[in-house]
Amino acid sequence: HHHPPKHSFPTRRSSDLIAMVKKKEPLALGDEAYSMYEKAPKNIEVKQPIINGVIADFTAMQTMIQLYFKGMHGKKFAEGLAAGGNAEFYIAVPSDITEVEKRAFYDLIASSSLKTKKIRIVEKPIADALGAGLDVMDATGRLIVNIGADTTEISLISLGGIVQSRLLKIGGTKFDEAIQQTVKKKHNLVIGMKSAERLKMQLASGIKEDEEITYDVMGRNLITGLPNKVTVTNHLIFEAMSESLSSIIDAIKFILEKTPPELSMDIMHDGVCMTGGSTHIKNLDLLIQQETGLSIMKMEEPELTVVKGLGMIMENPDYERLAHNLQDSDFH
């Protein structure tokens, strides 16, 4: 996230995908690339540069960042940024990844054509908690569960630092894949990831519902090889997602078991803060509440809390120590 003028944060809420014509120019970014996903001809690759919170394709990611700046502020801005050299970058990274993986995010900007004055790395759960309106600097323990597109990060925060954190390779995409597999098994129907996502949005629930709700989906019949339409129920979607949801619950319980008693009292009192785009799934809060006995705080725009938190860290000198220079010895 680059440093814009005070109080105007251009946030991008779009798919982190990039479409590249093989070995040539980038073609599309974000939602536009997503619309090509699974429809593109062989010479167009749709890549996901970040997988499970870690950079999987360095070149694609670098291209994507440069394109974002062109797209966000126009070509002039991008060229000015490359020439001017006074940009400040703040990058939120998962806490539970290796030092090398964290450094890769730093290198991404440092080795790009963007001239930078300052590159800072922020632990994502800290930015997340700040953006969610929690006071991260005091001695109170806060439990934050961020269920995103590709990962779920469960973190215990106190005194501006991370006490415990677990990063799971479970998120919206994993739910979509599970739905795709289950529909294939149950209905002999091959559906695309976008159709799976639509089923999730229409039918998913954190808690098994008594009432049956249905939604029609198009796909290719495995036996005949022909296009086919089937009616999928919410119960099937619940079955598809239950394993992933159980893993999230287990990880939350794991963090709670490892929480020091003083901080446990804080969490009993304040509950769990839920963020990330996947918290839009119906009854997911109810599931966590039932399984842990804790109250749940939900956000208005759960997918934007990290970005908001980064903005606060940039603008408020009191939060300076939450942003690390990778040369610092205090950053692990």
Each language-model region and where it sits:
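Nucleotide/phosphate-binding catalytic cleft detector across ATP-hydrolyzing
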Residues: 1, 5-147, 156-272, 279-306, ...
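Positively charged, low-complexity, intrinsically disordered RNA-binding extensions
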Residues: 152-153
